[in-house]
Regions:
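Charged, terminal alpha-helix-loop-beta segments
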Residues: 1-417
Length: 417
């Protein structure tokens, strides 16, 4: 069934229409919106039109585009107006904004504000009468208002779906329409791949800008990760952040990296020791001997215990996988896989439900030290959607970052000169 907001052919017009529908239907939401944008209380007797001019019949979309009219016009009969011009793929242009402002002046409005909306911040300075907001800021505001406004919630959800769809279609090339607010998958809201791709991009965009990851781990904020993820279906989607030390060297599997995966049942946050890692890095671990490796992982486990303290349901995690590829670009065939809770290797003074079985950690060390296959080892944490409520909270981004930072001792050993 077609969404009630999907009434226009141009994508930015659909978003503006969704926002205007919400403001028209919820008068209190409209008042809050005007105060948020202008900093002043909303005047009385407000009207809203789209793709038209006050006092004239509403035009169709094509005719409106030909005449270069504002996307929306909020006004009253006392010469007050708020004009809206929105973009997604095309840049904002000052001459277009000036024409809108001049049109309002010619029609007798003298208290004029022009709101310009885009996915990214404009590269040139905007006129003084223009207030700029990113679509992601509009989305964040709607999410806050959704605590009491059903229309704000509907509009925020529409923006989420639009971002997922337009990103997959290649229409949304820069910026984002939303911001990371958690991973909402649950029994009531099952995992779906396009949404997971959208959420993964939002999370990594935010994580890639974190100074603590640069400071503690040497993360490269300019790293490219996988680039475009072209898949359309699957039970997991993943991407990674590089370390500065890698110098963007290819293939990326020569260096450890920070991996985030959204799987059908959980979030997987890991430091990956890839199959093609430089021999020096692997030997730095192997040369510790099992006792040294045990002490190293005990330190990581202690760090993870602190990092996950308030993430009920999360667990420190190790994944060991042996794969092979029958031909280039083929899907991997998994020949062996071990996954285990890192707490199985260590006794604890605290009462814990996990029983000690140190042999899993020994098997990991043995596989690394006698590597003869396409072998990957990863250390970090899992956050199951069913048992870990923090996955659905914006603070999840901090747990992801802190999980990586908790694994710093492993990185330090691998990367030492």
């Amino acid at each position: 069934m077609r969404n009630i907001f999907d009434q226009y052919s141009q994508q930015e017009n659909r978003l503006t229409h969704a926002l205007m529908c919400a403001l028209t239907e919820d008068k209190k939401l409209l008042q809050y919106f005007i105060r948020w944008i202008t900093g002043k209380a909303a005047p009385k007797n407000i009207e809203i039109i789209e793709q038209g001019l006050p006092g004239e019949p509403e035009l169709d979309e094509d005719e409106s585009e030909k005449r270069g009219l504002p996307d929306a016009w909020i006004f009253n009969d006392n010469n007050w107006s708020l004009l809206i011009e929105s973009k997604i793929s095309a840049p904002l242009k000052n001459d277009q904004l000036h024409r809108h402002y001049s049109t309002a002046l010619r029609r007798g409005f003298d208290d004029i504000t022009l709101l310009a909306i885009d996915a990214v911040k404009p590269k040139s300075n905007l006129p003084a009468y223009v207030i700029f907001r990113r679509w992601s800021e509009i989305y964040t505001w709607l999410c806050v208002q959704s605590n009491y406004s059903h229309w704000a919630l509907k509009t925020a959800r529409f923006i989420e779906v639009a971002e997922s769809k337009w990103s997959a279609e290649g229409y949304l090339k820069e910026g984002a329409l939303t911001v990371f607010s958690g991973i909402p998958f649950s029994d009531d809201n099952p995992y779906n791949y396009p949404e997971a791709k959208r959420l993964l991009k939002l999370a990594l965009d935010e994580l890639g800008a974190r100074k603590d990851l640069v400071r503690e781990l040497g993360m490269d904020p300019q790293s490219l990760g996988r680039g475009a993820i072209t898949g359309r279906d699957g039970v997991a989607v993943w991407d990674f952040l590089r370390l500065k030390k890698s110098n963007n060297e290819e293939p990326f599997t020569k260096y450890p990296h920070l991996t985030l995966a959204l799987e059908s049942d959980k979030i997987l946050t890991i430091i990956t020791v890839p199959h093609g890692i430089k021999t020096t890095f692997r030997k730095n671990i192997v040369n510790l001997g099992f006792e040294g490796f045990y002490e190293l992982m005990a330190q990581v486990n202690n760090n993870l215990d602190k990092a996950l303290n308030k993430a009920t349901g999360a667990a420190p995690w190790v994944v060991v996988v042996q794969r092979r590829y029958p031909f280039q670009r083929a899907s991997a065939i998994v020949d062996a896989r071990i996954e285990y809770d890192l707490r199985t290797a260590f006794s604890s003074r605290k009462k814990q439900p996990v029983k000690v079985q140190q042999e899993w950690l020994k098997a990991t060390y043995e596989a690394l030290s006698k590597k003869r296959s396409n072998l990957q080892v990863a250390v970090g944490a899992i956050f199951p959607y069913r048992t870990c409520e923090v996955t659905r909270h914006p603070d999840m981004i901090n747990f992801i970052a802190n999980t990586w930072i908790a694994c710093k001792p492993l990185l330090d050993v691998m990367l030492k000169a």
